[in-house]
Amino acid sequence: MATGTQQKENTLLHLFAGGCGGTVGAIFTCPLEVIKTRLQSSRLALRTVYYPQVHLGTISGAGVVRQTSVTPGLLQVLKSILEKEGPRSLFRGLGPNLVGVAPSRAVYFACYSKAKEQFNGVFVPNSNIVHVFSAGSAAFVTNSLMNPIWMVKTRMQLERKVRGSKQMNTLQCARYVYQTEGIRGFYRGLTASYAGISETIICFAIYESLKKYLKEAPLASSTNGTEKNSTNFFGLMAAAALSKGCASCVAYPHEVIRTRLREEGSKYKSFVQTARLVFREEGYLAFYRGLFAQLIRQIPNTAIVLSTYELIVYLLEDHAQ
């Protein structure tokens, strides 16, 4: 009975710690997520730029103007949002994000912890294969449950309204999706989210390996008390940032495909069809639009989430003892 009670307390602890970590990270990095989503969208306005070229071999020596299209960068999108929509638009989608991030992180970390317990009994305990299967299982469950909320969040982030005009709130956006697309509309982009499980697996495999290395490092064993806690905390932040950065670079294209699938009235119908269409119309570089904003957002966000999670687990477990 005591063992069952202890397992229940551990699950609640991971739920609470994961929820707190996700909430803190979402608030701090919301503006960058809005910019990233705008950059990923097919509706991002391409600026036409004219480059003059002088051909000296011509009789008149006249210049020839070459036309090309340039994708706006992070700072240009930020400037456009501030000028046309106001600073509040940088926090579009924060409502559903806060509604969803705490339960999603809570479910994820609880599933991850539970799955790791199960897989430790099948494979070599705490090996990389355990972390891979645990992260993949947790991501699958979380994506399946939370996709409707993330769908609404993406729609709100893509909505463009001039400064001072009324924008849809979370409930209005959800109602509009239901009226125009039905229940299936809330699950657009889910296949891309499943493809993105590879990012989660890569991230946690690297993170757990780095965390194990930090525990065994000579510096960690030679310090004591407050100094050790501080070293561990910043070490975990660095490990989280590095693991997420590597994973994002490898698996980023699925994010662009997911955003395209969630656009209102879009021509994108399925994961494979969207990938082919984006490649044919825009080239392979389109799959990495917004990557810089993603790295700027996700690296500190993941560092905040994982470090807050580890800190709360450490403090509460230490307090319980």
Swiss-Prot record:
GO terms for cellular component: mitochondrial inner membrane; mitochondrial membrane; mitochondrion. GO terms for molecular function: pyrimidine nucleotide transmembrane transporter activity. The keyword Metal-binding does not apply. Pfam families: Mito_carr. It is a multi-pass membrane protein. The chain crosses the membrane at residues 12-32, 49-65, 121-141, 190-210, 233-253, 298-318. The keyword Transport applies. Keywords: Membrane, Mitochondrion, Mitochondrion inner membrane, Repeat, Transmembrane, Transmembrane helix, Transport. Solcar repeats lie at residues 9-118, 126-213, 231-315. InterPro entries: Mitochondrial_sb/sol_carrier (IPR018108), Mt_carrier_dom_sf (IPR023395), SLC25A33/36-like (IPR049562). One of its GO terms (biological process) is regulation of mitochondrial membrane potential. It comes from the Eukaryota. It is found in: Mitochondrion inner membrane. It catalyses: UTP(in) + UDP(out) = UTP(out) + UDP(in); dUTP(out) + UTP(in) = dUTP(in) + UTP(out); 5-methyl-UTP(out) + UTP(in) = 5-methyl-UTP(in) + UTP(out); 5-methyl-UDP(out) + UTP(in) = 5-methyl-UDP(in) + UTP(out). Belongs to the mitochondrial carrier (TC 2.A.29) family. Mitochondrial transporter that imports/exports pyrimidine nucleotides into and from mitochondria. Selectively transports uridine, thymidine, guanosine, cytosine and inosine (deoxy)nucleoside di- and triphosphates by an antiport mechanism. May import (deoxy)nucleoside triphosphates in exchange for intramitochondrial (deoxy)nucleoside diphosphates, thus providing precursors necessary for de novo synthesis of mitochondrial DNA and RNA while exporting products of their catabolism. This is Solute carrier family 25 member 33.
